[in-house]
Amino acid sequence: MATTNPGYLRCKEERNNKSFFMVLQSVDVSSENLVESCRYMTMGLAVKRALPYDFVRSFTDKELSLGISKNPTFYYMEKSGWEKFVRDNTLGTLDGKEMMQPPQPRAFLASSSRIRRFRTEQGEDDKKEEVVSESSNRGRTTAAESVGRKLKLGKKAAEESQESKRTEKVVRARRDEAGASSSTAVEFTAVFQPAYLYNLRIRSSVKDQMPVEKTIFKVHHPNGKKFWNVVYLGSYGAFSGGWQCLVKEYPLVVGDIYLQVYIHQTGGATSSCLQTLMMMDVRVRRNY
């Protein structure tokens, strides 16, 4: 069946080449079942890469380190392999051609390494020139502008100081509130239901005795050989993050199971997101 897709015809012609170069900017070849091609988007273009069959045969399994997805007509490089190839060869946005060849002698690799090092050093020199240019421009400000800038900085520092004091008061209040709500042990019993496979929502009467903020609980297994960090969300009154892992590894199953949960605080609030570290023991009693 004849085709009128010019992009596909180009692909068929490229297949017979010993080297490899394809940049399809606005060509739609999906209608020809070329759906396994990789797209490389960092150049702002939809770049598709195809390897001719004869070219791929020139590699051995040990030489070709890129992943290859086989297609009845073409061999396409996987995205991770292509991106590594681009990084190793320092191909930038101005590089319009990329050529692939079988492994080259060490002399060629050494020259490529020198080229990459030259490009890196050149980029660092350009950055240094920009910094020097900006600093020289800043040095031309007038005395009036300097005075105005100092006044603005002083006003901003005063505002930040007041804001930090207000934040410190709020933090202290929250810590006191969390400590008061969890200073005594909390105990409750619940029948394990299917909903508990995903999170454990506690009763309202128990929720009033729990921390009001996000809290991390360290849950120990009765045998003492394993523990889990489970996140308690005070606003929802439920154990969420890490709970599914606990259910799977404990293990807990739906059935005639009763949870006897004992909760007690072991320390103050940590500096990370005001998360209080607490201890929780989960004991299972099965009737079979």
Curated annotation (Swiss-Prot):
Ranges annotated as biased composition (Basic and acidic residues): 120-131, 156-176
Presence of keyword Transcription: yes
Record's compositionally biased regions (Polar residues): 133-144
SUPFAM superfamilies: DNA-binding pseudobarrel domain
Ranges for region Disordered: 120-176
Subcellular location: Nucleus
Key word Heme present: no
Keywords: DNA-binding, Nucleus, Repeat, Transcription, Transcription regulation
Main location: nucleus
Cellular-component GO terms for this entry: nucleus
Domain of life: Eukaryota
DNA-binding region(s), chain positions: 22-116, 185-280
Any GO molecular function: DNA binding
Protein name: Putative B3 domain-containing protein At5g46915
Source species: Arabidopsis thaliana
